[in-house]
């Protein structure tokens, strides 16, 4: 049995990964198959996720569009009039910035796919402004399985933006994504999932076989925030023994996991906009609504402090 301290790491903080590679990076963490990542592995992995309709992983990649007034109205019309049919329209975020005099729209890949899929089935044509067809064709792995796109050209126009193109704090808060991998225990990971506007992924105890050599045939637990005492060690070792006994009897990992302790290590990935992170820090690092759990604060406070240091224009006023 290993005992480690909790920690966090950024995933693609500088937004240099392609959407496909970022989806693969997060997705493989769930199955602990990061060793299979190569320069060409993203395409078959992402296509496999889509074919199996494992769309949750698509939420960790964000695409941002600049839009003219007419283009924004067209997209808004679809979201407002057909909210129930499209699903996830609230995940398509919008800002109008007087400084840049532009509309900005952003969403994760799952939300964009829902919008495209519904539009093509409803209108037979893709009822979107000029520029959107090229945007979709630029990502054939992500959108190529949907109905053939025939763009209904209107007066509006859209163009793709990157996070570095976001100028004002308002745009950054609404559209800039930040993905963080937390190495915490199962209890803290469960608390993180309560932030429902964020997207989540985590190492799965259904598929991670701790009796396998990949894990050293042992479990890893997170040390308590205060101190490690004999009772904690004994309880964790007992859980490990019972888990291994279940596996040796032929029980699958998804059944044997019922023996695991809440202190078992979990790698949990969380993607949210900077605005959402700001609200999360307010609750989990700064105790705005009461004292945060010590083990949650143990990772959230240093993460918040690093974000303040690197992005003071966004986080300096939390």
Please give the residue ranges for each predicted region.
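Family-specific signature for flavin-dependent thymidylate synthase
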Residues: 1-318
């Amino acid at each position: 049995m290993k005992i480690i301290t909790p920690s966090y790491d950024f995933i693609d903080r500088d937004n240099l990964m392609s959407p496909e590679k970022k989806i693969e990076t997060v997705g493989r963490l769930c199955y602990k198959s990061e060793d299979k990542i190569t320069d060409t592995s993203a395409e078959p992995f992402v296509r496999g996720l889509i074919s199996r309709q494992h769309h949750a992983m698509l939420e960790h990649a964000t695409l941002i569009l600049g839009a003219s007034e007419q283009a924004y109205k067209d997209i808004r019309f679809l979201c407002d009039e057909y909210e129930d049919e499209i699903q996830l329209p609230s995940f398509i975020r919008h800002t109008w910035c007087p400084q840049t005099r532009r509309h900005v729209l952003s969403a994760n890949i799952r939300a964009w796919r829902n919008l495209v899929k519904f539009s093509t089935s409803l209108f037979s044509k893709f009822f979107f402004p000029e520029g959107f067809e090229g945007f979709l064709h630029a990502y054939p792995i992500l959108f190529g399985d949907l109905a053939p796109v025939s763009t209904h050209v209107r007066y509006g126009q859209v163009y793709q933006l990157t996070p570095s193109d976001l100028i004002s704090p308002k745009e950054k808060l609404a559209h800039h994504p930040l993905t963080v991998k937390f190495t915490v225990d199962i209890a803290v990971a469960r608390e993180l999932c309560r932030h429902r506007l964020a997207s989540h992924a985590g190492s799965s105890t259904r598929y991670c076989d701790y009796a396998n050599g990949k894990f050293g045939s042992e479990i890893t637990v997170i040390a308590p925030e205060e101190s490690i005492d004999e009772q904690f060690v004994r309880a964790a070792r007992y859980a490990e023994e019972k888990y291994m006994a279940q596996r040796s009897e032929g029980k699958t990992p998804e059944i044997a996991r019922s023996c695991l302790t809440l202190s078992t290590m979990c790698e949990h990935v969380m993607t949210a906009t900077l605005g959402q992170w700001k609200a999360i820090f307010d609750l989990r690092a700064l105790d705005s609504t009461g004292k945060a759990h010590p083990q949650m604060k143990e990772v959230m406070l240093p993460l918040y402090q690093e974000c303040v240091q690197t992005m003071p224009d966004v986080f300096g006023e939390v």
